[in-house]
Regions:
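Short, well-ordered loop/turn sites that connect or cap secondary structure elements
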Residues: 532-534, 559, 566
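Extended, highly charged accessory segments
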Residues: 467-470, 474-537, 551-552, 595-596, ...
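Short beta-strand-centered aromatic/proline hotspots
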Residues: 570-577
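Short, solvent-exposed secondary-structure boundary/capping segments
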Residues: 578-595
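A conserved acidic, glycine/proline-rich C-terminal tail/linker
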Residues: 545-564
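Helicase motor core with emphasis on the C-terminal RecA-like subdomain
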Residues: 2-10, 15-19, 27-34, 40-53, ...
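Acidic, Ala/Val/Gly-enriched low-complexity intrinsically disordered segments
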Residues: 197, 204-207, 217
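Cationic, low-complexity basic patches in intrinsically disordered or flexible, solvent-exposed regions
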Residues: 201-202, 211-213, 220, 228
Length: 864
């Protein structure tokens, strides 16, 4: 379908907005003007522009211009216009900031529009107000949007809707929350189609009745139940740069079944990247200790900038960094804050407001401040440790200089010396715009099952109609009719395996309409709409006063009364657990346990891995060593030692090291493909070697390579190495190598929760984690035995293969290795490359203090 084009300059709305911008001594950017033209033409698409250049205004002001064009004479006076713009955002923290920016525009234009926010933090009273009188703009999370679809009479909410905007679409794409957005859009788009059909029917029916009653008194026609939408809502995504923008657009607009456009700003955001180089480069590096020792080096950065964000990859490490900065610089007390997802919401909100006000010098944070929050006082960002991907590093850099023409400044602080190689790789990747793609998810049956029940507790649904809608989404375009029928059977009768249990017969069929009428089932479902399944979180509270934050159940279960742990930057003594709340008191102890949260370790992205291999290619060149690159230059002593003992692999080479120590026989392999792929590869290689000779292994891995350790020589040599790394029989071998059924069992817990098979409990009375897992295991066993073709069971295995083990990337790696030269060396001792992997293998059995002592002794012996 050809895109309509309208000259926006001549419209009344544009003239009003242009005058408003001029009053602030600003002009619209070309990409904003292009977006406004497309918005007022009723087209859909994706906006891509650098951070700080007004992506939000590109779509929001398009909506305002639309409205002014519709009511040029009285746009300022018109009230209660119904929901015009639905703004979907992935983070609650973003909602307040976006709402503030929109309110400012509306107030200065003198319009009567109201900006509403709806998420888990919205008070019930505010939600009730919205129900009776919707604001013109509603900023909402995917979960809260599905809760709206769960209300009876929800079509009335959207009858005036003109635009659906999805902010930070690159963050939602490739996640189950993104699938939620796809499904919601399919419903909202089809509400309009329903309305058009109803309108046509109404017109034809009116005409018939006129003919029938032409010679008698006219009869009133009751059309109160038919309230047609006035338009076709256009859909706009707002996205940072990713490697597959075209696909991102197609996924978002799939339900429209018409071509969309990409509006890409031709603006280059200036980014300054500087590495914090240690005074002394360790030739035997190891992860996790160096960063803290470099804390002193970022004090001048904090001092010379208005506000600095210090990004740490895990919540546990952010607690350590906060304490360390206060130790090395006590004068930061009062102007240094901590922000992560487990700190109580009120404290997080205070930190965000203080950032806006510019009263903080620095904030130690995690990904909780990753996304587009506009903190203008932030002048500099420090990234501690590997960001694991190019896009994430760019995103974090963009938190500084968050306005047009400002420079984004970011410092890379390594947690071990080899990470300086990543700094060099990141610089080159950004210079070449070599940014990761976000792969969309397919056939998420757990999300679909939840969505079907959501529709069933509102007005119900007719299967044939909803099936067509669902097939219009990108995620479910390949769904088969037999799969759809299996889902319908499951929600109405419990499927084949569970048809004896009434708890799984949630949906009734009333004259062909699928509907949930049981109030208890409906209430439980509403409470657990969403796809974010985390380990059970328990609130932490002072014995005498307020809440501090939340901690994971598994961590608290290991503590004894009197143990001291750190949360929200405070040392706390554990007293007891009472009514699912951890009671604590302040502790003056200098020693404490720092919580670690599950899932804290992200894998290295394929793009960054590729760039690392390219940088190694440069480092391996003795004649043309890149002395001008200060990161590689600083690492030269390490590379020289690696070459002396073993080799530095080129881009088209794979290095394997055989090393014998008192611990046994080690095999180290360096694909530079990230922890998850290495974990799968280690298991696969071990399985294939065990078919050659009976042998047992222990594994260790990091983002650069992996280790197999055995008590006997490991039979890998030039005669069999290519065969061992073959992609032949990969699927079958990996299933046997990793105990796929046990991994699928663990995945199934989350799938069962999202799909509504397991109830997580009432607020404040959450079901314990071990009980959830045992319930999920029981269901898994039942399906495996009595319903092996169950869709949720199949999904669990698919998620293990294609997400957890990244089978596609593993296969690509094996194909690359087949084209590479494999270098096998036999170093006399541990090398700089294998040392961090060796240290990682010792972590599980040693405390951090004992580990540091052991590593120091090993380094001294190796340096002799």
């Amino acid at each position: 379908m050809k895109q309509q084009k309208i000259n926006v300059n001549s419209t009344p709305g544009f003239k009003v907005i242009k005058a408003w911008l001029a009053s602030k001594k600003r002009k619209p950017f070309l990409f904003q003007q292009q977006t406004w033209e497309q918005v007022i033409a009723g087209n859909s698409g994706l906006v891509n522009a650098p951070t700080g250049y007004g992506k939000t205004y590109s779509v929001f002001l398009g909506s305002v211009i639309n409205f002014i064009n519709e009511y040029p004479k009285d746009f300022a006076a018109k009230k209660n216009n119904g929901l015009q713009l639905l703004w979907v955002t992935p983070l609650r923290a973003l909602a307040k900031d976006i709402g503030r920016a929109m309110e400012e525009v509306i107030t200065e234009l003198g319009m009567q529009w109201r900006i509403g926010i709806r998420n888990g933090d919205t008070p019930i009273s505010e939600r009730q107000k919205q129900k009776t009188k919707m604001p013109e703009v509603l900023i909402i999370t995917p979960e809260s949007l599905h809760l709206l679809l769960a209300q009876k009479g929800y079509p009335d909410i959207f009858k005036q809707l003109k635009i659906i905007a999805v902010d930070e679409w690159h963050e939602l794409l490739g996640s189950k929350r993104g699938v939620q957005v796809e499904l919601a859009i399919s419903r909202l788009v089809n509400l309009q189609k329903d309305s058009m059909v109803n309108s046509q029917w109404l017109m034809e029916n009116n005409e018939k009745k006129k003919q029938q009653h032409i010679n008698s008194a006219p009869q009133p026609i009751n059309n109160s139940t038919i309230q047609p939408l006035n338009h076709f809502p256009s859909i706009w995504g707002i996205s940072a740069t990713i490697g597959n923008l075209d696909e991102a657009r197609d996924v978002l607009l799939s339900s429209l079944n018409k071509e969309g456009i990409i509006i890409k700003a031709s603006l280059d955001k200036k980014i300054e990247i500087a590495s914090v180089i240690p005074d002394e480069i360790e030739k035997y590096p190891w992860a996790g200790h160096l960063g803290i020792k470099l804390a002193q080096k970022i004090l001048p950065v904090i001092e010379h900038n208005k506000t600095t964000l210090i990004f740490i990859n895990t919540r546990g490490m952010s607690e350590i960094w906060y304490q360390q900065l206060l130790t090395v610089s006590p004068e930061l007390a009062g102007v240094l804050a901590l922000h992560h997802g487990s700190i109580e919401r009120e404290l997080r909100t205070w930190v965000e407001e203080a950032l806006h006000a510019g009263i903080l010098k620095a904030v130690v944070c995690t990904s909780s401040l990753d996304l587009g929050v506009d903190f203008r006082p932030v002048e500099t960002v420090v990234q501690v440790g590997s960001p694991k991907g190019v896009a994430r590093f760019l995103q974090r850099a963009g938190r500084s200089g968050h306005q047009p023409d400002a420079v984004s400044k970011i410092y890379f602080l390594p947690t071990h010396s080899l990470e300086l190689l990543e700094a060099a790789a990141l610089k080159e990747a950004i210079a070449e715009s070599f940014i990761e793609s976000r792969q969309p998810l397919l056939l998420c049956f757990d999300v679909l099952m939840q969505y079907m029940c959501t529709l069933a507790i509102s007005d119900g649904f007719y299967p044939d109609k909803i099936f067509k809608e669902i097939k219009s989404t990108f995620c479910f375009r390949e769904i088969l009719e037999e799969e759809w029928l299996q889902l319908l059977q499951f929600i109405t009768a419990g499927g084949i395996a569970l048809n004896q249990y009434d708890d799984f017969k949630k949906v009734e069929i009333i004259d062909g309409l699928y509907k949930i009428t049981n109030r208890r089932i409906a209430m439980r479902h509403r409470m657990h709409i969403g796809t974010i399944v985390s380990d059970a979180m328990i609130k932490v509270k002072f014995l005498s006063s307020g809440f501090i934050g939340v901690i994971e159940e598994w961590f608290i279960s290991r503590l004894n009364p009197g143990d001291v742990f750190t949360l929200a930057g405070r040392n706390l003594e554990f007293i007891m657990i009472k009514e699912m709340t951890v009671l604590v008191k302040k502790s003056n102890s200098k020693k404490s346990i720092v919580p670690s949260w599950m899932g804290g370790r992200l894998p290295l992205s394929a793009n960054l891995g590729q760039m690392l291999r390219r940088k190694l290619n440069e480092a391996s060149d003795n004649e043309n060593f890149p002395e001008k690159e200060k990161e590689l230059s600083a690492l030269k002593p390490l590379f020289d030692l690696q070459k002396e003992l073993s080799a530095v692999p080129k881009e088209n080479e794979l290095l394997i090291e055989h090393i014998e120590t008192k611990d046994g026989f080690h095999l180290f392999v360096y694909p530079f493909e990230g922890r998850l792929v290495h974990e799968a590869m280690a298991a696969l290689l071990a399985y294939r070697i065990s078919k050659i000779t009976p042998i047992t292994f222990s594994f260790a891995m990091n983002d650069y390579g992996f280790e197999l350790l055995s008590d006997q020589p490991i039979p890998v040599d030039d005669s069999n190495v290519y065969e061992l790394f073959s992609e032949e029989n990969l699927f079958a071998d990996i299933q046997k190598a990793v105990n796929a059924s046990e991994m699928a069992r663990r995945k199934f817990r989350d799938i069962a929760v999202i799909g509504g098979l397991i109830f997580q409990g009432m607020p404040g009375e959450k079901v314990k984690q071990k009980h959830l897992q045992s319930s999920a295991s029981l269901l898994f066993n039942v399906f495996a035995e009595y319903e092996p073709n169950n869709l949720l069971l199949r999904q669990a295995y698919n998620e293990v293969m294609y997400q957890q083990m990244d089978e596609v990337r593993l296969r690509n790696m094996l194909q690359r290795i087949q084209q590479s030269k494999i270098i096998i060396t036999v170093p006399a001792r541990l090398t700089p490359f294998c040392f961090p992997i060796k240290v990682d293998s010792m972590r599980e059995n040693l405390t951090s203090e004992k580990l540091e002592d052991r590593v120091r002794r090993m380094q001294q012996q190796l340096d002799k």
